[in-house]
Amino acid sequence: MEEIPVIQIYLWGNLVGAMSWDEERGYADFQFDDKFRRSGLDVSPLMMPLARTRGVVSFPTNARTKCFSGLPGLIADALPDKFGSQLITEWFALQGKTEDMITPLDRLCYVGKRAMGALEFVPAAHVDGVNESTEIYIRELMALSESIFKERSKFQELIRQNDKSILDILKVGTSAGGAKPKAIIAYNEDTDEVRSGQVHAPDGFSYWLLKFDGGTYSEHHEITDNPQGIGNIEYAYYKMATACGITMSECRLLPEGDCHHFMTRRFDRTPTGEKIHMQTAAGIAHLDRDVRHSYEELFGVLRRLGLNYKDFEQLYRRMVFNVIARNHDDHTKNFSFLMDKTGKWSFAPAYDLCYSYNPAGRWTSHHQLSLNSKTDDFTREDLLAVAQNIGIRDANHIIEEVLSSVSSWPETAKECGVKPEHIEAIGKALILTI
């Protein structure tokens, strides 16, 4: 594949702008298309507002960061994280490109029209069959997701052989964020058939993100390391979160052998598969995922976007839930915003709510977002101080609702098929006396 000097970015068929890559400086130059700038669709309202963004713009502070890779946050959100990025790296290796030769623009061209959200990138890399809707098999994808990290030579040989199972995982696994293996699927509830969710599927299919149960990670013992049964745990957390008023997309478990894969309906797609523009908090406000930020900063993003009180209360409920339920994976890419075709922004449903606490963990020993200048050892006074500062009403009532829901952990977990040893370990860590 030849070097890509310039790529174009599209939204709903309209040219948004163009971008080039400066290898020496390590960051991209971006420019809005004049016609799009007059459209009033503020796709990046905080960092590149249309009214104030003219000519070529770049963000040198984003250079060589894992979160942004030298790109504007608007564009960086379309890059896959560890799992999807590793898939793309292996595909490029077979095209003769080593990892240090692959630019972020190359990766965006590989993603093409298959990014999360609604942005599309041209020219798109040609991958045989990747844009076709065909049936896929979860068991095969699970085994392959393991080989990507454990048996690289075997995985590359399958790519060379143009193995159908490799094509399947390239179809479904290269766009989603996060470090752990997942797939973008289309699912037929009547037949249980699973197809690639990266392209338009036939009638009767809906669009989901599937997280592989951790059975392929047999060397991992900590709950935070994605053991078999993690799907059941996340499903129980979904049940507890929605029970205390947190808005989430529909979630399910997909049984497959001894595993239960966690599925969540995509909120960046309409029921008919139309795309919705999406930005994470990291992308929309350039809040680097790998740098400590605060819930107060997130509330500031909601305020700058002009969101309503209901959205502020939603964020407050999520904050309280994350504290009580020990979800320390509360970084800035785990909160998102949606823009409709009129340019109106809203707070996206909650996602990635799961137990994530390890006292010895580098990232999970403390919360990624601070509140009231603390990252752990919170008191009710800390939660109430945040509520007072941002104007949340009935904060004590919200805290009690969350406590009541999370206190049901043993019963909810058992109903959701969580293993007894996981029920016990998580139960001991929950903060139920705040």
Each language-model region and where it sits:
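Phosphate/dinucleotide-binding and metal-coordinating scaffold of catalytic cores
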Residues: 1-332, 336-434
